[in-house]
Amino acid sequence: MTATEINFDGLIGPMHNYAGLSPGNIASATNAGAISQPRAAALQGLAKMKRLMDRGLVQGFIPPPRRPAVAALRALGFGGDDRSVIARAAAEDPVLFNNACSASAMWAANAATVIAAPDSGDGRVHLVTANLATMLHRSFEAPDTFATLRTIFADQRHFAVHPALPGTQHFSDEGAANHMRITPRHGERGLDIFVHGAARGSRFPERQAKRAGEAVARLAGADAFHTLQSQAAIEAGAFHNDVVAVANEHVLLAHAAAFEDRDGLFAAAGRAVPDFVAVEVDSIGLDDAISSYLFNSQLLTLPEGGMALVLPSETRENPRVWAAVETILAGNNPINEAIVVDVRESMRNGGGPACLRLRVPVGEEALRAIDPRFLLDERRWEALCALVERHWPERIDAAELADPALWAAAGAAHDALDTLLARV
């Protein structure tokens, strides 16, 4: 079938802050306590979306959940009206409260795992909400994400939206950031590759459990290949596979140290897709790869043909990394263009261009079935930019998250977004 891959980017929320909540995420830890700029962050994300729209690519967005996460705090025993719930949590358990203020849902690659219709057992696109069970602040996201995905992809003739797996370490699931699809073209059957973070029973935590990938594949009725991310990459700070590898159609771009069983993975991909192309980079170390987020780039098929890497501007600031980019572009592979974007506010919390988007391949009828409010055109994009300019805070000090004025401003921003979505 003819298929379109849509990038649904997370709209960065008004509570974007640097509270340093994610152990193993070097950027998050390094910038803990810094001043964030929610307005600039959201506009940077929207500018990235516009760059791809201008190239003829279909672009969607996922609205942020309200933060602080009142429903989660209420479920943990803080009573009263919303303001009282927030105030009590801030006073009685500041660490929990900071986790409830996280805007980490911006990283839509962790929202769900998407199984394309040609790969699924029933011919529908399956979206399995990620439980994000390993990190407290991220575990609060799943209920809102499930509800939002059910709104965007409500037509059950074409889409099956699944709730999150049980929120335990045994099924810890961080979504599409640990899933790749190798296929001749987006509309054809492909190989779903699930990358897990540690062998069962090892001393390392399974931020992405193998059992989670197995369950996701069962839910969608998909054949799958499961492989282990290299421990060297994890210890260097690659807390998700998409920090060291990215795939698009028949091409896999990866650091040479990304996988424990590189040969087995490449052999499986080659059996599934005979024209499989592996582009490996061994000219830079894992430290450069992770600090620049070279592999956390979007790899896209352009309407006019060829593929482009959508790279964070940090890749251009490191001469070794940029030399690697030039080598990729000059190589015997379909990647022939680099699109450099500024997503610095997200990068400082550990999320590059690929983290910010959820890829959803759809056929023509399924595309028409998506709620159009969440597909961007010029008018909707301009309306979102104006909304952010008007309502998103200019700056947030992570030490001041307990300020009631900040909660009120964030609530007003979400109210304005709800109003916009009701009319566009």
From Swiss-Prot:
Q: Might you give the EC number(s) for this enzyme? A: 3.5.3.23
User: Which residue positions are annotated as catalytic?
Assistant: 174, 240, 355
> Pathway, per Swiss-Prot/TrEMBL?
Amino-acid degradation; L-arginine degradation via AST pathway; L-glutamate and succinate from L-arginine: step 2/5
Keyword Hydrolase among UniProt keywords: yes
Question: Binding residues for substrate, per the UniProt record?
Answer: 19-28, 110, 137-138, 207, 242, 349
User: Top EC class per UniProt?
Assistant: hydrolase
Question: InterPro entries attached here?
Answer: AstB_sf, SuccinylArg_d-Hdrlase_AstB
Q: Per UniProt, which keywords does this protein have?
A: Arginine metabolism, Hydrolase
Query: What the protein does?
Result: Catalyzes the hydrolysis of N(2)-succinylarginine into N(2)-succinylornithine, ammonia and CO(2).
| Protein family per UniProt | Belongs to the succinylarginine dihydrolase family.
Task: Tell me how this protein assembles.
Answer: Homodimer.
Can you say what this protein is called?
Answer: N-succinylarginine dihydrolase
Q: Which organism is it from?
A: Rhizorhabdus wittichii (strain DSM 6014 / CCUG 31198 / JCM 15750 / NBRC 105917 / EY 4224 / RW1) (Sphingomonas wittichii)
**Taxonomic lineage:** Bacteria, Pseudomonadati, Pseudomonadota, Alphaproteobacteria, Sphingomonadales
